[in-house]
Swiss-Prot record:
Record NCBIfam families: mycothiol_MshC
SUPFAM superfamilies xrefs: Nucleotidylyl transferase
One term of GO molecular function: cysteine-tRNA ligase activity
Chain span(s) of sequence motif 'KMSKS' region: 289-293
Family label: Belongs to the class-I aminoacyl-tRNA synthetase family. MshC subfamily.
Positions with a binding annotation for Zn(2+): C44, C231, H256
Species this protein is from: Stackebrandtia nassauensis (strain DSM 44728 / CIP 108903 / NRRL B-16338 / NBRC 102104 / LLR-40K-21)
Function: Catalyzes the ATP-dependent condensation of GlcN-Ins and L-cysteine to form L-Cys-GlcN-Ins.
Protein name according to UniProt: L-cysteine:1D-myo-inositol 2-amino-2-deoxy-alpha-D-glucopyranoside ligase
Residue span of motif 'ERGGDP' region: 187-192
Amino acid sequence: MESWQAPDLKRLGGQAVPLRLYDTARQAVHATEPHPDGARMYVCGITPYDATHLGHAATMVTFDVINRVWRDNGHDVAYVQNVTDVDEPLFERAERDGEDWVVLGMRETALFREDMEALSIIPPKAYVGAVESMPTIAALVERLVDAGAAYTVDDGTGDVYFPVTATEGFGSESHYDRDTMLRFFGERGGDPDRSGKRDPLDALLWRGEREGEPSWESRLGRGRPGWHIECAAIALAHLGDRIDVNGGGNDLIFPHHEFSAAHAEAATKAVPFAKHYVHAGMIGLDGEKMSKSRGNLVFVSRLRADGVDPAVIRLALLDGHYREDRPWTAELHAAAADRLARWREAMGMSSGASGTTTAQRVRERLSDDLDTPGALRAVDEWAAASLTGAHHDAHAPALVRDTVESLLGVTLLRAVFRQRTTSATTLDRSR
């Protein structure tokens, strides 16, 4: 699957700082120690039944900064992101709107790519859809069946499930108690009340063919995969048995990341599947999490269509720590616009305060579990000092600009991004 155009990245001088990140599984901040061959990161992507909202954008910006800090440290980064282009929400939206689910998925995936390019997100080396990966996914289900880590429900449906007893460490990523697991499982795509399962928490691996639903061939019979096995299969195929970071929003801690890790570990016996499980906080609006079910979404494409500079969107999302749930407000938006204007003014001067000191402070803050608010403050202080006209480092504006663009991903020369000619229907969310 096609990704998007990469932003320009400059190699910075000076001393990079190794990255430390909070690991959900170990519940503490630890150094990331990528393999000498390169860092490996898998981030769960969109289910393309609607446009990119600010919650998606915040997550993608988070892992983009990780990518940038690793690159600053000289690591080659193998970054893989999936597209869940076969799933119930996609089918339901397509049926509601009287549209082919394939066409809907392709259109919204194209819009997502445009949004990511506008936000200066470094594209993944492999941008992979579930549909194109179906043979790989089916093969992993078959592998789990052969290993005794799956069972078929005895009701003639052909549905195959993964038992929570298949791995000894189930629950070690989320640390949730059983009641919490059951609640989230039911709320986030699971089927705890499904009859015939050995345990209410057992997760679907393969859904047997149903009339009116898409299906694919496998040794287990025609059908389609469950959600969690898709990510496990794609990650294993493109990154190997163990990865450095498995990431997404904090609503994926359970069941999605718990089960995708368990699927991978049951198949490969490589434990843990990821050295770091990293989760971004939710973006809220009017005191509630931003979500499609609540209808309170702010779309990146709508902001762009209204003339909002993508750099302002990115700065606003960087203003809070990535692990915190935080609101999107008019005040946040306005503050980001003001900040960007000050930065651009300061970086347009012929000289300024010490750029070397500021660049190092930005590196130090980002390497400390992505302290983006601290990094922004470092640039704020440099801009304020430079705008007084009392400092005369002629190299500073260019150095700080390169630091901001390379590490924070904030574009300081405004760019014009293309809009799709078909965007009118996509951007009209009033229906």
